[in-house]
């Protein structure tokens, strides 16, 4: 597959408080928009929320959000076009999605780059972990020990 990302920042406390619901609404809107286009099961979307749980995800022990959150939307599609399209839909939906307490209608997220969707290229997945028991550690290469 191929990866496309978009990066944005949020400072609206209401947006941050409703981020789980907002993410669900974004995914649902994309599914509705692409329904019947033959893209079902051809992409994944991940939201990395730096300043909330961007590093540890659901294992984050500190559940107190800061005053701003950095959003990295990570889309992997079967084709580059699918990745770019879904990333663009995610960006535009995040920008204009409604949520309780919303005051600004001009945009919810600040995007530092234009164009906001960044093609990252082919995706590689680590899927094999090689371990080999050997009798002689120097058989496959030189080993040096330093003190």
What are these regions (language model features)?
Residues 1-147:
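C-terminal non-catalytic interaction/assembly regions of soluble proteins
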């Amino acid at each position: 597959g191929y990866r496309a990302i978009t990066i944005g920042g949020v400072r609206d406390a209401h947006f941050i408080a409703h981020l789980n619901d907002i993410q669900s609404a974004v995914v649902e809107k994309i599914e509705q928009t692409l329904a019947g286009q033959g893209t079902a099961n051809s992409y994944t979307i991940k939201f990395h929320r730096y300043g909330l749980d961007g590093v540890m995800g659901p294992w984050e022990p500190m559940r107190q959000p800061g005053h701003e959150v950095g959003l990295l939307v990570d889309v992997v599609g079967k084709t580059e076009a699918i990745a770019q399209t879904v990333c663009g839909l995610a960006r535009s939906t995040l920008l204009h999605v409604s949520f309780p307490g919303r005051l600004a209608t001009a945009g919810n997220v600040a995007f530092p780059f234009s164009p906001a969707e960044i093609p990252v290229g082919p995706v590689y997945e680590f899927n094999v972990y090689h371990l080999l028991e050997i009798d002689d550690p120097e058989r496959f290469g030189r080993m040096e020990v330093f003190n």
